[in-house]
Amino acid sequence: LGVINDELVFASKSTTEGMHVDLFKNLFQTLPTSLQEEIKELLKRNCCSMMFEVISQEDTHIIKYDQDHLYVLDMIQNTLDVNGKHIDVSFSRERLAELDSILKKYDTQLISIVKTIQQVNTMDELTNIINKELNSHHESEGFVLVDSNGFMTKFKGPYYNTWRYRRNRILRPYQ
């Protein structure tokens, strides 16, 4: 989600058109109008964009979700290079803290900021977490690792991968 010429710009899967963009936009527009405006002003003031995970009952998904939800993953500057880096971690943390303050003023369960579940300090801790997650079969899509430089890597779990493979095998003859 970004702002261009004072208008919110919705994008999904690297495009501003299509079903997923419409789902995202429609969900976002169910938020209180004043909250939408505060988010827009936050983005404009800081020249940044928000990254979301959009959960919609209208989008068939391998993992069953009981309700629609907008998970804020990150807020990033609208530039390709930030002081020699691609991601400014302190900028992101500060903007997310601002957003958190805004969200606390509203009684909505539709939008929230993704929380850190566990922080690791050694390679052994990281290896143990990855092995544990990749060998579990709980009903989740997976997990996201964020390093100290703000780079994110998404791991799909075995439950998700198994059912995605099965779904694709079943649907292949019909495509």
What are these regions (language model features)?
Residues 1-175:
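Core nucleotide-handling region used for phosphoryl-transfer chemistry
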